[in-house]
Amino acid sequence: MNEPIVRVPWPSRDSGGSDATLNREWLVTNGLGGYASGTLVGIIARRYHGYLVAALPAPFGRVMMFNDLVERLEFPSGKLYQLGGEERAGVPLKMEAAEHLAEFRLEAGLPVWRYELESAVIEKRLVLPHGQNSVHVNYRLVSGAEKVRLMLRPSVHFRPHEEAVSAELDAAYVLVVADDRYEVVLGEKLPPLRFLLYGSRAQLTVDKLRIQQIVYRIEERRGYPARGDLWSPGYFHAELGPDADATLVASTEGWECMYGLKPSEAIAAEQ
């Protein structure tokens, strides 16, 4: 029997305030002890928020490997929209995603965001394949535009998932590129974080960046260290169209494992 679709009312009656909005969260697990979690509006606010907390062999345990993903959409009109992101110290918090989020739902326990921007409808879907330290983030143009340019900036801070966000960010991250394979490497102890981008005109623009003084509002409210830095290798981009989805895959698994499960297969396997 298929699991029911659970729809979360949005805008909600408590979505007017920033703190209340950031309290609306999601969580997905991978069957290994790893997980992904975040707020519905895409702002990281806890030390546990991230796209991939990998369950690694001892002595590492659960490690935050893929912290955040800033999403931008550029329309043929030239208009640019940002979804998600970070709150920065001294900068007013903007939750642009909240203005355009028409619906959030769970399909078979997996989160789906439905955005309405200009005349277009775009859906984002997140899948953690069972038994893998991997995450698939899929974007689909449902209707309303011939094409939309998608830009994705991932950022990382490899750390134990319970460690404070203020822990020092290592300066030795290295980006390794070979054809369509991208790896973020930090020394020899932890596995690299590997990326694949499926989509039309998919590529990476190398633009290394240290994102400083991110505020984790829920950590701050709880009295814990609440400011930290992330490192980004650059940004991926692809073109969305009526028959052209895009999927970013991030994983600590080997390349054979990543290539062995296509995005459509990952979605079908979890439904």
Tell me the role of every PLM-derived stretch.
Residues 1-271:
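Terminal accessory carbohydrate-recognition/targeting modules of carbohydrate-active enzymes
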